[in-house]
Amino acid sequence: MSLILPLEKPALNLRPLLWLLLPLLVLATLFFWPLSLIVEQALRGANGEIGLETFRHVVDSKRFVGALLNTLQIAFFATAGCLLLGSAMSLILVFIPFPGSELIGRVVDTFIALPTFLITLAFTFIYGSAGLLNGTLMSLFAFELPPVDFLYSMQGVILAEITVFTPLVMRPLMAALRQIDKSQLEAASILGAHPLRVIGQVIFPAALPALMAGGSLCLLLTTNEFGIVLFIGAKGVNTLPMMVYSKAILESDYTVACMIALINIVLSLGLFSLYRLAASRTGVRS
């Protein structure tokens, strides 16, 4: 007669759930709860009811439409400038080494650690109305007014953001360029390929993931950049982060400020989704 022994169920291991609970609590406390407060404040109308009254009021405002267009224009032009300048400098530093190229690479790395207001302060000292360039030109050619006045415009903001965020493109791009097999470049040169063709058919496909990663990061940062626009004080240049600041701090209109901040968050998530879509279409893993 055989005995049938009951099978013992293994004890439930709760340790993985406990390890998961801690980061969820941190996210809920530091991110989801403040975000929910912003959403609740943005959707609460003047009568205290939840609705889209504030949203309709904001999107119908010409000031908001202008700030949205300025934000997108600055973000796209600054990102394009970062990609062009970062690509050119990375190609030179990696494939055309010269005395001091390593030092320049280290200086580029240090730019990432600098606060943005230091770059804008340097721009003010150089290109400002009483800066070094205008002072020199006015003393040499007896100009009555400063001849260089682009700094306090959208062009000045874009140039400052290109200077600040180009290293974010260069770091991953230079790392990717150093991984390219030099024998492929030598073979293309021996076969008589033009340098531009080598860049387009050999270097660019290998560097595309790094370009997309750096470009997407620049696009998100320039969309949400606040310090450069505020410090330069560009005339007539209002962006969504600047509008959030003015509504909350200067006008004490927290409901409208929260709604604009919520729209800015949705815009950033939309741009990031476009990047992920483009990355999946091109076969780039991210």
Curated annotation (Swiss-Prot):
Q: Which CDD domains match?
A: TM_PBP2
Pfam families in the cross-refs: BPD_transp_1
Q: Which GO terms describe its cellular component?
A: plasma membrane
- Where located? Cell inner membrane
Residues making up the signal peptide according to the UniProt record = none
Keyword terms: Cell inner membrane, Cell membrane, Membrane, Transmembrane, Transmembrane helix, Transport
Please tell me whether the keyword Zinc is annotated for this protein: no
* First-listed, main subcellular location of the protein, grouped into a coarse class: membrane
Q: Which stretches make up the ABC transmembrane type-1 domain?
A: 68-275
**Top-level taxon in the UniProt lineage:** Bacteria
* Disulfide cross-links: none
Which InterPro entries is this protein grouped with? AminoethylPonate_ABC_perm-PhnU, MetI-like, MetI-like_sf
**Which stretches are transmembrane?**
19-39, 76-96, 111-131, 150-170, 202-222, 254-274
Topological type in the membrane: Multi-pass membrane protein
According to its UniProt entry, the protein's GO biological process terms are:
2-aminoethylphosphonate transport; transmembrane transport
Carries keyword DNA repair?
no
Report the family membership.
Belongs to the binding-protein-dependent transport system permease family.
Q: What does this protein do?
A: Probably part of the PhnSTUV complex (TC 3.A.1.11.5) involved in 2-aminoethylphosphonate import. Probably responsible for the translocation of the substrate across the membrane.
Check the record and name the PANTHER family matching this protein. Answer: INNER MEMBRANE ABC TRANSPORTER PERMEASE PROTEIN YDCV
Q: What is this protein called?
A: Putative 2-aminoethylphosphonate transport system permease protein PhnU
Species of provenance = Salmonella choleraesuis (strain SC-B67)
